[in-house]
From Swiss-Prot:
This is Metal-staphylopine-binding protein CntA. A lipid is attached at residue 21 (S-diacylglycerol cysteine). It comes from Staphylococcus aureus (strain NCTC 8325 / PS 47). The complex is composed of two ATP-binding proteins (CntD and CntF), two transmembrane proteins (CntB and CntC) and a solute-binding protein (CntA). Gene3D superfamilies: Dipeptide-binding Protein, Domain 3, Periplasmic binding protein-like II.
Length: 532
C-alpha cells in the first residue's frame, strides 16, 4: 500500500477528511464565486512568453498566437485569414481589427512586427524551434496586414506559429528598451484572462477579461495555488481549499492513481483524460563516451529490458497505453507502424554478452576490462510515476547484471542535463501533439534538445541533413516517408525507448461542465468551462 493510501486511511479513521456528501463548504463557495483553484507544485514563474521561465498553462490564459492548431487543422485566431506564396516562403496575415491588449493598446500589424522581431532578437534561445532559424523579416503592409518572410519554404510554419510560446503577443508598452529579451514591465496579452495578484511561491490569480474580443469566460477567476505533490495536494482537494488539478507542463503529476480514485469516489469530483498527447520515453545518451551507453549494442540491449506492458498496467494503472513506437498514429504525418524492440530479457542478455560485458563468478554485476557495468538514471522527482518506473527498471537491470543508480531531480535540472549531456539515461517525453513530429525530430540535432543524446551516432551528420531536408517537403506523403526513414535510423540506434503514450489528466468538480482539451498538453481552455 502506498504512503498516501496509509495516510488517507488514518485521517479517515480520525474523521479529519470531509466526505463527499454535498457538505464541502470550500467547493460550494468556489462554485458560487465561479472560481477554480488548481494545485501546482511550482510557482507560475516569469510570465514573459518570449522566454521559457513561466508555466505554459498559465501563460496560455493571458497570451494568444496568430492561429490555432486544432484536431481539424490550423484555424484563425488573432489572424482572421492568411495567404501563402507559391514558393512557400511568404505568409501574409490579415488581422482581426477588434482586438486590444489588456492595457487597452490596440492589437495591429505594428504590434505583431514588434513582437516577432523581439522573439528573433533572442533566436538562439529558440533554436529548438525550426521556424526561429528561418524567419528573414516581418513587414507591415497596412494597419491590419502583416507579411512574414522565410529564408526557405518550411511546411510546419503555421503549426509552430500556433504554439503557446514564443510567437504570442505582449503589449508593446510592456517592452523594456523596445524588446522583451531582458524582461517585460507587465504581462498584458490579448487572452481571456488577465494576471491579477501574484504571491511568489504561494499563489497567482487570473481574472476574467471583461473586454475580451472573443467569447468571454464563464469563470470569474482561475487561481494557481502552490503546494507539494502527494498528501498536501490530496488533502487540499478533499477539503475544497483547491478544486482542480491537472498534469502540468512541468512534467509533474500532483496526484497519483490512488488519490485520483479516492477523490472520484467522494462524489465531489470527476476525472477526465485526453487523447494521447505525447510519448513518455527513456533517453539513452549515445554521446556519453565514458559509459557503456555509448555502445550501440548496449543501447539495443536496454531496449529489450523495458517491459512497457507491465509499466502501463501496473504502475500507470492502465491510464496510459504502452507505446510501441516513438509517435502515436494520431500525430500529423505519422500514418505508419514502426514497432520498436519488444521486452525480451534473453535477447538483452545475448546483446550484452556480444558487447563484451560478462557476468563473473564472484559478482552479480557484469564486467569488461575490469570495469563494472554501471549507469546513472535521472527522473523528475515531482512525478511519482517516474519514480516508480525508475525503481522497477533498477530491479530489471539488476537481473541483467547492470548496476543502475537512480536519481530524482527537479524538472529544471533534468532539462539542464538534457542540454549538457550529463546523464546516462533519463526519463523524458516527446514535445507533444501540437508540436510533433517536427519539433521532437528537429530536437534530435539541437543543442537545447537531444543533440547530446544523438551525438554518438556514427552517421549523425547524414541523419541531421535528412532532418533538414524533410522539413522542406511540401507533399504530405513524401514528407511522411522522409520522417519514416529518419525514425527507422534513430530507432536502430536505441536512443529513444518509448514507454507509454501520455495523456493529460484533469480532476475537476463534478458539476463543472465543458471540461475539454486542446491539441496541447501544455494548456487548458479554462475560458470555456462553467458550473452547472
Amino acid at each position: 500500500m502506498r504512503k498516501l493510501t496509509k495516510m488517507s486511511a488514518m485521517l479517515l479513521a480520525s474523521g479529519l477528511i470531509l466526505t463527499g456528501c454535498g457538505g464541502n463548504k470550500g467547493l460550494e463557495e468556489k462554485k458560487e464565486n465561479k472560481q477554480l483553484t488548481y494545485t501546482t507544485v511550482k510557482d507560475i514563474g516569469d510570465m514573459n512568453p518570449h522566454v521559457y521561465g513561466g508555466s505554459m498553462s498559465a501563460e496560455s490564459m493571458i497570451y494568444e498566437p496568430l492561429v490555432r492548431n486544432t484536431k481539424d487543422g490550423i484555424k484563425p485566431l488573432l489572424a482572421k485569414k492568411w495567404d501563402v506564396s507559391e514558393d512557400g516562403k511568404t505568409y501574409t496575415f490579415h488581422l482581426r481589427d477588434d482586438v486590444k491588449f489588456h492595457d487597452g493598446t490596440p492589437f495591429d500589424a505594428d504590434a505583431v512586427k514588434k513582437n516577432i522581431d523581439a522573439v528573433q532578437e533572442n533566436k538562439k534561445l529558440h533554436s529548438w524551434l525550426k521556424i526561429s532559424t528561418l524567419i528573414d523579416n516581418v513587414k507591415v503592409k497596412d494597419k491590419y496586414t502583416v507579411e512574414l518572410n522565410l529564408k526557405e519554404a518550411y511546411q510546419p510554419a503555421l503549426a509552430e506559429l500556433a504554439m503557446p510560446r514564443p510567437y504570442v503577443f505582449v503589449s508593446p508598452k510592456d517592452f523594456k528598451n523596445g524588446t522583451t529579451k531582458d524582461g517585460v514591465k507587465k504581462f498584458d496579452g490579448t487572452g481571456p484572462f488577465k494576471l491579477g495578484e501574484h504571491k511568489k511561491d504561494e499563489s497567482a490569480d487570473f481574472n476574467k477579461n471583461d473586454q475580451y474580443w472573443g467569447e468571454k469566460s464563464k469563470l470569474n477567476k482561475v487561481q494557481a495555488k502552490v503546494m507539494p505533490a502527494g498528501e498536501t495536494a490530496f488533502l487540499s482537494m478533499k477539503k475544497g481549499e483547491t478544486n482542480f488539478a491537472f498534469t502540468d507542463d512541468r512534467g509533474t503529476d500532483s496526484l497519483d492513481k490512488d488519490s485520483l480514485k479516492q477523490l472520484k469516489d467522494t462524489g465531489d469530483y470527476q476525472v477526465k483524460r485526453s487523447q494521447p498527447m505525447n510519448t513518455k520515453m527513456l533517453v539513452v545518451n549515445s554521446g556519453k563516451k565514458d559509459n557503456a551507453v555509448s555502445d550501440k549494442t548496449v543501447r539495443q540491449a536496454i531496449g529489450h529490458m523495458v517491459n512497457r506492458d507491465k509499466i502501463a498496467k501496473e504502475i500507470l494503472d492502465g491510464q496510459e497505453k504502452p507505446a510501441t513506437q516513438l509517435f502515436a498514429k494520431n500525430v500529423t504525418d505519422i500514418n505508419f507502424d514502426m514497432p520498436t524492440r519488444k521486452y525480451d530479457l534473453k535477447k538483452a542478455e545475448s546483446l550484452l554478452d556480444e558487447a563484451g560485458w560478462k557476468k563473473g563468478k564472484d559478482s552479480d554485476v557484469r564486467q569488461k576490462d575490469g570495469k563494472n557495468l554501471e549507469m546513472a538514471m535521472y527522473y523528475d522527482k515531482g512525478s511519482s510515476s517516474q519514480k516508480e518506473q525508475a525503481e522497477y527498471l533498477q530491479a530489471e537491470f539488476k537481473k541483467m547484471g547492470i548496476k543502475l543508480n537512480i536519481n530524482g531531480e527537479t524538472s529544471d535540472k533534468i532539462a539542464e542535463r538534457r542540454t549538457s549531456g550529463d546523464y546516462d539515461l533519463m526519463f523524458n517525453q516527446t514535445w507533444g501533439l501540437l508540436y510533433d513530429p517536427q519539433s521532437t525530430i528537429a530536437a534530435f540535432k539541437e543543442k537545447n534538445g537531444y543533440e547530446s543524446a544523438t551525438s554518438g551516432i556514427e552517421n549523425k551528420d547524414k541523419i541531421y541533413n535528412s532532418i533538414d531536408d524533410a522539413f522542406k517537403i511540401q507533399n504530405g506523403k513524401e514528407r511522411s516517408d522522409a520522417y519514416k526513414n529518419i525514425l527507422k535510423q534513430i530507432d536502430d540506434e536505441g536512443i529513444f525507448i518509448p514507454i507509454s503514450h501520455g495523456s493529460m489528466t484533469v480532476v475537476a468538480p463534478k458539476d463543472l461542465e465543458k471540461v475539454s482539451f486542446t491539441q496541447s498538453q501544455y494548456e487548458l481552455p479554462f475560458n470555456e468551462m462553467q458550473y452547472k
